[in-house]
């Protein structure tokens, strides 16, 4: 496994940052729970670029499934690439890079993949154009993003309504689009793709273990992650509001009736 560094242009601000409560969720991600829509396209020998790979848990699965095909994981955060680099595979590389200026020649990869990335960039169409550039003719660009406006939960807890409203305000204040899932198709069309297959899937948290895992993460995130600081700095929330939201997540996690669904839009666009 080799690691490379490239000059990275200053990125849009990542709303959640890389607090331990955020990386806890990122290391949970797998092909099964986050890229199942792409699974039928994965075959040995295929090359793949994983943009915004984070700590690399999905990327290393790609490397195992596609071997001996080359897999490259890329992220704009050097500290996250350091974490991902613990995965050692002969066909796997990690690098620090910029989605707007990918350090590859044209027509390099069979698949260019981005999970939960386009929601965080100010220019998703430009990012998709650059992803298309490095995809081989007939290859695919695959993307999956959550849609915060579509998240539903039970029981009704007013603090969670406040959470979503404040989160969306902060996310947009940082240059992103929290309702990206519903926009993936139109962004791909604007990027020049003509053949865009769409699908949708949902993360669901309901049993006691899942509620505790998800609820405790947000209970902590709203007080200690980059989101908390930005909410205060942007005037989107007061400290008292954030503390109330943290308690709301604890209330939801402790409720036997607790249920939450997070919808995701998905696209497979042919280059």
Outline where the language-model segments fall:
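C-terminal helical/coil "lid" or tail adjacent to the Rossmann-like core of SAM-dependent
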Residues: 10-14, 20, 197-260
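Conserved alpha-helix/loop element of class I SAM-dependent methyltransferases that forms part
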Residues: 27-44, 61
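A short SAM/SAH-binding and catalytic strip from SAM-dependent methyltransferases
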Residues: 110-124
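Conserved catalytic/acceptor-binding region of the Class I
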Residues: 142-211
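Core SAM-dependent methyltransferase catalytic element
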Residues: 191-194, 262-271
């Amino acid at each position: 496994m080799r690691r490379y560094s490239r000059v990275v242009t200053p990125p849009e601000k990542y709303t959640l940052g890389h607090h331990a409560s955020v990386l806890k969720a990122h290391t949970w991600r797998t092909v099964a729970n986050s890229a199942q829509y792409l699974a039928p396209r994965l075959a040995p020998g295929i090359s793949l670029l994983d943009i915004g790979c984070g700590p690399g848990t999905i990327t290393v699965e790609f490397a195992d499934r596609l071997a001996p095909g080359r897999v490259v994981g890329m992220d704009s955060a050097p500290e996250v690439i350091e974490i991902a680099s613990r995965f050692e595979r002969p066909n796997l590389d990690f690098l620090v890079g910029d989605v707007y200026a990918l350090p590859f020649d044209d027509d390099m990869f069979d698949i260019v993949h981005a999970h939960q990335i386009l929601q965080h960039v100010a220019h998703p169409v430009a990012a998709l154009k650059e992803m298309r550039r490095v995809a081989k003719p007939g290859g695919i660009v695959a993307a999956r993003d959550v849609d915060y406006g579509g998240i539903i939960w039970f029981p009704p807890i007013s603090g969670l309504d406040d959470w979503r409203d404040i989160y969306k305000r902060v996310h947009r204040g940082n240059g992103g689009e929290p309702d990206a899932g519903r926009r993936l198709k139109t962004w791909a069309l604007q990027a020049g793709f003509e053949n865009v297959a769409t699908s949708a899937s949902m993360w669901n948290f309901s049993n006691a273990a899942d509620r505790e895992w998800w609820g405790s993460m947000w209970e902590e995130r709203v007080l200690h992650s980059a989101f908390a600081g930005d909410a205060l700095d942007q005037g989107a929330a007061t400290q008292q509001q954030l503390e109330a939201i943290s308690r709301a997540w604890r209330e939801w996690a402790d409720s036997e009736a607790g249920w939450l669904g997070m919808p995701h839009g998905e696209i497979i666009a042919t280059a």
